[in-house]
Regions:
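Glycine-rich, basic loop-to-helix element that forms the pyrophosphate-binding segment
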Residues: 69-86, 96, 107, 148
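Short, acidic, metal-binding catalytic loop of nucleotide-sugar glycosyltransferases
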Residues: 32-41
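A conserved acidic beta->alpha catalytic loop
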Residues: 33, 47-56, 71, 95
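Acidic helix N-cap motif at the loop->helix transition within catalytic regions
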Residues: 25-28, 52-60, 99, 103
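Conserved nucleotide-sugar donor-binding catalytic segment
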Residues: 84, 141-230
């Protein structure tokens, strides 16, 4: 029995880290999808002090490693704990409301190990509906740049979190996810890794990422707060050595591209709120869009229309 157990530990190559908080109902599906995503893997569930039935749910599932945090520290803290707990060379990340597709990790492992200079591999995600995680038909991103992607990534975070498989050593050397970031901590990590490493990509769906809406109780459902936190992450990346050593015109370009993207996201949210009759939400998003791109005519026009409307 001991020989069998030791051999099992040796051949495992991938740890799938699943941070969770009060998602006992969704967690079993995430765990099952992780198990089917590849061979030679372990599943580590990091419970960020859930107050629901999460401990009992995990106790009833055989073959997983369950780690309960002493205090609720957020996603970055939980993911770092999972990485530290990992006994494998490679680490994949999966949120408790997302799903991995069968066999996806084996394909990504092949791409990741093709070059020692590669820090992580990502792929496309099918966007799932907020309630049942069923694919909506939308795929993100449409294209998956690879190689040296630092400057492309500085414009926008196009890497779906549940699609990433990384070398544990690079995550540790980067000092893990930044616990001071309550949102967009993944983009910050990918930027730090891509600054001086190559990135591999599998341009096919490898995960199902649940669409974020306010009703789904997801941290990433507030578009305005996401954009504000993302701006902070980009500003942090722009003072890192590689960005600082580049031409100022290049830095200005990626800043403009990001602000344009934030503006588009917020104006889309505002338009959706208008159609749903949520006047105050629409007004708030337009004001935030105006802050990112104050000289865009469309934002100015809608802003003043809303301010004058009774």
């Amino acid at each position: 029995m001991w020989l069998i157990y030791i051999f099992t530990l040796i051949v495992r190559k991938i740890s799938v880290v699943i941070p969770t908080y009060n998602r006992a109902r969704l967690l079993p599906r995430a765990i099952e999808s992780a198990r089917n995503a590849g061979s030679d893997l372990e599943v580590i569930v990091v419970d960020d002090c859930s107050t629901d039935e999460t401990p009992e749910v995990c106790a009833a599932i055989d073959g997983i490693r369950y780690l309960r945090m002493q205090t609720n520290g957020g996603l970055a803290h939980a993911r770092n704990a999972g990485v530290a707990e990992s006994s494998c060379e490679f680490v994949a990340f999966l949120d408790d409301d997302d799903l991995r597709l069968p066999g996806s990790l084996d394909k990504q492992l092949h791409a990741l190990t093709s070059d020692d200079r590669i820090a992580f591999c990502y792929g496309q995600a099918l966007i799932g509906d907020a309630r049942r995680q069923l694919p909506t038909g939308e795929i993100y991103p449409l294209r998956c740049p690879d190689g040296d992607i630092f400057w492309q990534l500085l414009e926008d975070n196009f890497i779906p979190m549940p699609s990433v498989l990384a070398r544990k050593s690079t995550l540790v050397n980067a000092d893990g996810f930044n616990p001071s970031l309550k949102l967009i901590e993944d983009w910050d990590m990918w930027l730090r890794l891509s600054e001086d490493h190559l990135v591999a990509a599998v341009e096919e769906p490898v995960a199902i990422h649940r669409k974020a809406v306010a009703e789904s109780d997801q941290m990433c459902s507030n578009a305005a707060e996401i954009c504000k936190q993302a701006l902070r992450v980009q500003q942090m990346a722009l003072v890192r050595p590689r960005a600082r050593a580049s031409e100022s015109a290049k830095r200005r370009y990626v800043q403009k591209k990001f602000r344009d993207r934030a503006y588009e996201i917020l104006m889309t949210e505002a338009t959706n709120s208008i159609h749903e009759g949520k006047r105050q939400a629409a007004k708030t998003n337009i004001l935030d869009a105006f802050r990112f791109r104050p000289f865009r005519t469309m934002a100015s026009g809608r802003l003043f229309w809303f301010l004058s409307y009774r």
